[in-house]
Regions:
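Outer-membrane beta-barrel translocator/receptor signature
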Residues: 8-12, 23-90, 95-105, 116-117, ...
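Outer-membrane beta-barrel domain signature, strongest for Gram-negative TonB-dependent receptors
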Residues: 94, 100-218
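Flexible loop residues that form catalytic
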Residues: 19, 78, 82, 112, ...
Length: 218
């Protein structure tokens, strides 16, 4: 889901598992799995914050905080924001595209009811609203040159540069790519250990709304 595109601030580990994994991870894992495990809530207060800045107005802020609520219950809250101006100019509209505008928040509650029973509640929300993504050509092929020789005079302006500047960050689109994705979910985990058997139950619900438009060059 959209979480894969956001900055994960509280990672415990990342596992790359090759080959079919349907027995453990379901039918959509026939080619392998990238398993991302986040940190559990902890019984001691702690946290971190990370701030990054860069070209094109890049601003990335993320943080996580964890701590106890009671003797057996603890929490963890993780959030991040990622913003950046567009750096590729659409010669048709004059707009700057390939921007970033992403947000995410995740909250966990962990309750160790007994030595054998553990309950865990997770709620998360992710959002992306971007004019993204497109690329720039490294060279002009015959089809591109033919298209430009016809369309350019009709519009009264050049639609390509020849030769291409590979670092020019320019494109020509009559429909700009756009991505708007909002996802949210909740899951409840029950772990119960018996003498020779470990029982695990996961009940979850996830909702996603997407508006994705591909760029059109004609």
């Amino acid at each position: 889901n959209q979480s894969a595109l956001n900055d994960l601030m509280s990672l415990e580990r990342v596992e790359v598992i090759k080959g079919p994994q349907s027995t453990l991870f379901g039918k959509n894992s026939s080619a392998g799995v990238i398993s991302i495990t986040t940190k559990l809530p902890e019984n001691e207060f702690g946290g971190k914050i990370q701030i990054t800045g860069g070209d094109y107005g890049l601003q990335k802020i993320g943080g996580t905080v964890t701590g106890p609520i009671s003797e057996n219950t603890s929490f963890r809250i993780t959030a991040s924001t990622h913003e950046r101006d567009g750096y590729t100019k659409n010669l048709n509209t004059g707009n700057e595209i390939n921007d970033r505008d992403r947000y995410s928040v995740r909250a966990q509650l962990l309750s160790e009811v007994s030595d054998r029973l553990t309950l865990r509640l997770i709620v998360d929300s992710d959002s992306a609203d971007e004019n993204c993504c497109t690329t720039s050509a490294l060279t002009n092929g015959a089809a591109t040159l033919g298209f430009a020789s016809v369309i350019g005079p009709m519009l009264g302006k050049p639609v390509i540069k020849n030769p291409v500047d590979p670092f020019g960050y320019e494109t020509y689109l009559d429909k700009e790519p756009r991505t708007k994705i909002d996802t949210s979910g909740i899951s409840f985990h029950v772990d119960y250990e018996m003498e020779n058997v470990k029982f695990k139950s996961i009940t979850a619900y996830r909702e996603s709304e997407q508006e994705v438009f591909d760029g059109d060059v004609d």
